[in-house]
Amino acid sequence: MTRNILIWPVLLALFAGCADTPVKPGNGEETLDQHLPLRLAVDMSPEDLALQTHNFYNLRAYYETYHWTEEGKLVRKAALTAFAPLVEQVLPREEMPEPDLIIKVRGRSVFNPMMQVWYVDVTATGYLPSGEEIASFKASSQVGGVLVFHEQALESTYVAAFQETGRKFLNSGTLSVVARQHSSD
């Protein structure tokens, strides 16, 4: 009995870093490591950036907790992480005065405490500095088996969803067209 009790903390410690594991492209998918010669700004509305969510976690009726997550800031951080391999420079909109491309992001999440699964939906809309919309993509992601480290699991789920939108931007050719326009200027 004591042996079984001691193994759980060891397993939790071993799998704690799994939430930060990046998603690898499947067969036929384009790799995100492109480093196109673009300066990309990630933009969010002030309301979305200020979003805080309240989640309830219950571990088999033995442990209950309520947790506030600054989800707006987490969404922006995940978008910056996911889009970084695509281009030379990625910064929040307010930190980049003259971007070549602006991507406005939005994300929403739902946590199922009984199944311990995070569900995430994201939208990424690309704009030229002139304000012209060039493309908009949506993606979803989920991660299950979340017993601890909920915020890291939520962030990795957002990163996976934004990586999917990044693949859609690449596959549509939108980023390549903007990079060619920028290099010809």
Briefly describe each language-model feature range.
Residues 19-27, 86-152:
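Surface-exposed short loop/turn segments
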Residues 18-76, 174-185:
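A structural "domain/chain start" motif
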Residues 9, 17, 124-126, 166:
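Small side chains
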Residues 1-2, 93-98, 182-185:
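Extended alpha-helical regions
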Residues 72, 76-80, 84, 121, ...:
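Extracytoplasmic/secreted envelope proteins and their assembly/folding machinery
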Residues 60-68, 130-179:
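Short secondary-structure boundary motifs at beta->alpha junctions and helix caps
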Residues 1-18:
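Sec-dependent bacterial lipoprotein signal peptides
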